[in-house]
């Protein structure tokens, strides 16, 4: 299962609105088929793995990070039917698909076809890998990650506005990897006017996976950019699983005040700025007690001279 989830994780940011599924077929202890959801969402991971395995799928075990689909599309039969027809003996899935078009129906097709089904292995890891898709199905909007590059004392720029570069090359390379795993990246009008950002991916081999660009602004449309008039417009992004917000203080504040941020990436540099621009303004909290319990620390590690801190929103808090 770990291999299947890893395959799907590589495809994150390329498959929306479909999930980034990974699949492995094992026959006699040997991996005979591998697949991940293709760019654009089709073909599905299971179909790719079945095509590679061919006749070796018969009586084999298929590991998939998500329940095989059960709905018929113009592009072909549902994956659950393909698996049953291929004669596999067993399917191990990490998660049931929350998409109402499947939602257990894929497992029913498999069982009706004589395929043994086990669910739950690797569930926690699969939820992390497909967090964007799962968030969109649950909340009706993309999973939103806020990226902040800060000094030790929490500043994003000097009083003059100068901010290039607070962090070093390793931290900036990690940001580009996050971009490659996002379907869309957003900045505010202030960042757009000050920096004219390209927001592309500049890592060798990943340049084709630069995300779509969005601008949070009530101004005139800008060619090559998708416009969001307010943070609440994210509920209209039905074809985006993962949204990365890279704007300045005003944009960060707007999304946090609207409680639309699911994950925060803080790239903290070992520098002191003193008087400077703060990362976030007023977000509606008037008591320290109300701030506690809303976020949990998920990760922390060094990136060259800098430090990455990852925080996840605790929903319901």
Regions found by a protein language model. Give the residues of each.
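Enzymes that bind and transform nitrogen-containing heteroaromatic metabolites
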Residues: 1-16, 33-34, 52, 57, ...
């Amino acid at each position: 299962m770990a291999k299947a989830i890893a395959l799907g994780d590589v495809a994150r940011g390329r498959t929306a609105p479909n999930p980034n599924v990974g699949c492995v077929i094992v026959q006699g202890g040997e991996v005979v088929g591998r697949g991940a959801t293709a760019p654009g969402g089709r073909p599905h991971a299971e179909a790719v793995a079945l095509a590679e395995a061919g006749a070796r799928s018969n009586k084999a075990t298929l590991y998939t990070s998500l329940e095989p689909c059960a709905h018929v599309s113009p592009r072909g039969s549902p994956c659950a039917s393909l698996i049953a027809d291929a004669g596999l003996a067993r399917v191990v899935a990490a998660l049931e698909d929350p998409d109402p078009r499947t939602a257990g129906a894929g497992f029913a097709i498999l069982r009706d076809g004589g395929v043994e089904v086990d669910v739950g292995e690797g569930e926690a890891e699969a939820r992390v890998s497909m967090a964007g898709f799962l968030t969109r199905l649950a909340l009706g909007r993309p999973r939103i990650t806020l990226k902040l590059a800060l000094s030790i004392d929490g500043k994003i720029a000097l009083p003059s506005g100068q901010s290039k570069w607070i962090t070093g090359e390793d931290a900036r390379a990690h940001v580009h990897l996050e971009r490659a795993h996002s379907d869309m990246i957003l900045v505010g009008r202030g960042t757009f006017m000050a920096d004219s950002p390209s927001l592309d991916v500049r890592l060798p081999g990943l340049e084709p996976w630069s995300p779509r660009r969005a601008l949070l602004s009530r101004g005139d449309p800008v060619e090559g950019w998708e416009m969001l008039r307010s943070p609440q417009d994210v509920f209209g992004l039905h074809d985006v699983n993962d949204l990365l917000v890279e704007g300045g203080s005003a944009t960060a504040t707007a999304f946090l005040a609207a409680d639309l941020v699911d994950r925060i990436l803080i790239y903290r540099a070992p520098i002191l700025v003193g008087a400077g621009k703060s990362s976030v303004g007023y977000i509606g909290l008037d008591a320290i007690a109300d701030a506690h319990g809303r976020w949990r620390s998920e990760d922390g590690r060094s990136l060259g001279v800098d430090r990455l801190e990852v925080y996840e929103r605790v929903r319901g808090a």
